[in-house]
């Protein structure tokens, strides 16, 4: 694709037809893709749609270090943030399932050290997506004229509450109780940094942010 906006639009076209589709880009690329992305939150999906953002804290190879968790909050879509290579695989698989269950695009946030990491990853058997691939005409869902968008806005708010309930039961959000005097809240790679320096502290580890 010529740019990130077009890449996300092509990904959405595949999702509309029922295919599972993923778009991957750097954090600044999401700025370019923000136009269709914000509307995709209203439209929802047919086949699962995942947007992977690779953020760059400390500006290892980028022009800024924006935190794209703000995009997920802005668009009211779920975001998963893996802390190692195994979770990167597992959370991406889960992201497709959540996307189809809740009719929403899902973001997965990597950062520089996750993207450059190596590790042993346990694989599973390939899963055949359950949705047949076919073009569906659904004007009220896929055409965001104001009259339709107002209805979908209400859907987004209802979906947000359902996602909140899911997050509260999600196994990737967990507590590790050790030293009761000090607790650290982490998400993604910060969990690994914390455990390396303070192995005996207690942790709230967030996999869905």
What are these regions (language model features)?
Residues 1-101:
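Thiamine diphosphate
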Residues 82-209:
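Flexible, low-complexity linker and terminal segments
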């Amino acid at each position: 694709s010529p740019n990130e906006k077009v890449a996300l639009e092509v990904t959405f076209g595949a999702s509309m037809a029922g295919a599972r589709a993923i778009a991957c880009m750097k954090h600044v690329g999401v700025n370019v893709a923000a136009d269709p992305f914000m509307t995709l939150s209203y439209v929802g999906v047919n086949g699962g749609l995942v947007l992977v953002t690779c953020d760059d804290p400390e500006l290892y190879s980028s022009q800024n270090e924006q935190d794209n968790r703000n995009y997920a909050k802005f668009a009211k879509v779920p975001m998963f943030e893996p802390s190692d290579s195994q979770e990167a695989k597992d959370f991406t698989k889960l992201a497709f399932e959540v996307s189809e269950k809740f009719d929403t695009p899902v973001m997965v946030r990597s950062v520089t050290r996750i993207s450059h990491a190596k590790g042993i990853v346990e694989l599973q058997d390939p899963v055949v997506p359950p949705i047949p691939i076919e073009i569906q005409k659904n004007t009220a869902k896929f055409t965001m004229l104001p009259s339709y968008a107002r209805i979908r806005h209400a859907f987004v708010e209802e979906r947000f509450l359902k996602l909140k309930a899911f997050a509260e039961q999600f196994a990737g959000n967990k507590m590790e109780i050790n030293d009761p005097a000090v607790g650290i809240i982490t998400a993604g790679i910060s969990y690994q940094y914390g455990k390396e320096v303070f192995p005996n502290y207690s942790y709230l580890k967030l996999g869905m942010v």
